[in-house]
Each structure stands twice: as structure tokens, then as C-alpha cells.
């Protein structure tokens, strides 16, 4: 293995199902998420608002862990090709944190759809793009659990709902954003090459995880199945949220309209 391959391997760490830590972290994440959702269901009034603010403060601190760890640890090389929070999960980590204060409907819609997709797949098929140091590993599971759980809390405890056709709006936003990030990857890798490539949102090369939605195809063709999978996931998540937290304006409409629009 040459030096470049060693650097790349140190960044892209895949945790496989045959590793004990895979199951420890997965089960702990599911249990923690369930407990937090149930705890918020029992809160009312000022205590509920205070809990949401505290959760926002906590998540801001969680999002600051990777850059602070890189700045304070002399063994870590902060790299613009990997350390910027412009993966979907990194963006949604900040959005769910800030939306604890903003309570913005569009931010909720975007982060609930894409945070759920990214968070669930990250927990089931983890790939740590900046290595698996204990601090980074812990941050990975905190962040990806939070981007699934916090939107559920916002919907169940604070009354947020998906707007009609919100899943289509989210797909368009995700397509535009990921394409822009793909151009950013190209710029970094072409004009500022480094030992490790910029692969934000996996728009430069496919993820390395064993996932049925990730096909062994050349760029850019592997992106097409990912877009198809994105649409499928958006429809399924919209169905689940509409079932658990129905939209009042659609009461009395047909079953298909209530679940899929």
C-alpha cells in the first residue's frame, strides 16, 4: 500500500456488521433516540420550550466537536477536502440544532426528510470519512442519531408537519445542492489536489459501504440509482410522517392524497 492509499484508508473507515462496535453503537443509538422522544412527549409549557433550547445548545456543541478536535489535536490534519460540514448529514446536523431556536417550517421539512434518510443509512452502513478516532466515532453516532430523532420530536411534541408536496420540493432542493457540491468537489480536486480527494455528498466517487442502493458504476452513472433511491425514500418518509402526524388540511381527503401528497 502506497502513502496515498494509506492516507485515504485512514479517512474512509467503514464499520462492518461483523464488528462488535457496529451493534453496540447501533443499539445504543436506537435506545437513546426512543428514550429522548418519549421524554419530550411528557413535557409541557415552559419546561418543553427549555428542553428544546437545551437540546439545540447541546447539538451546536456536538457539531463543533470535529473542528475543535482537529484544531486542538496536533496529530490531526484539518483538510478542506474532508473536514468541511457539507455532507448532507453535516448540513442537517447544523440545521436540526439551529431549528431548535428558529422553529422554521422549511428547515424542518428539509432536515426531516434528508436527515432521516442520511441518518438511518449512516447508522446501518457507517462510513466515517475523517477516520474513527474515539471522539470522531462518538460524534458520528450522536450526530446521525440526532438528525433522525430531532425532527420526530419537532413533529410529535411541537406540531410541525410536512406541507403538501413537501417531498418534491425537498428532492429539487437536494438535487440542486448536491450538484453544486459536486462542482465544489471538482474545483478542489482539480485546482487544489491533495493526498485525499474531496468527496462531499459522495458526488466524486460512490460510497464504499455495502448498500443495495450503491451500485458499482463509473462516475457519474452511479449517481442515477442514488437519485432514484432518494425519491423512493422521500415517498416512504412522507407516508410514515403523514401516518404518525397527519396534516389537518387533508382530513377528509382520500387515503392516497393524505399519505402521498
Where are the predicted features?
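Structural signature of hydrophobic alpha-helical transmembrane segments
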Residues: 22-28, 77-89, 109-112
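Membrane-interface loop-to-helix entry segments
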Residues: 84-85, 138-149
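Alpha-helical transmembrane segments in multipass membrane proteins, preferentially the mid-helix core
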Residues: 32-38, 96, 147-167, 178-179
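Membrane-interface helix-boundary motifs at transmembrane edges
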Residues: 40-53, 101-107, 157-168
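Membrane-interface transmembrane-helix boundary segments in multi-pass integral membrane proteins
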Residues: 12-30, 167-171, 175, 188, ...
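Membrane-interface helix caps and helix-loop-helix hairpins in membrane proteins
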Residues: 71-80, 101-106, 126-139
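Aromatic-anchored segments of alpha-helical transmembrane domains
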Residues: 59-68, 115-126, 174-183
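A glycine-rich, hydrophobic loop/mini-helix early in the fold
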Residues: 48-100
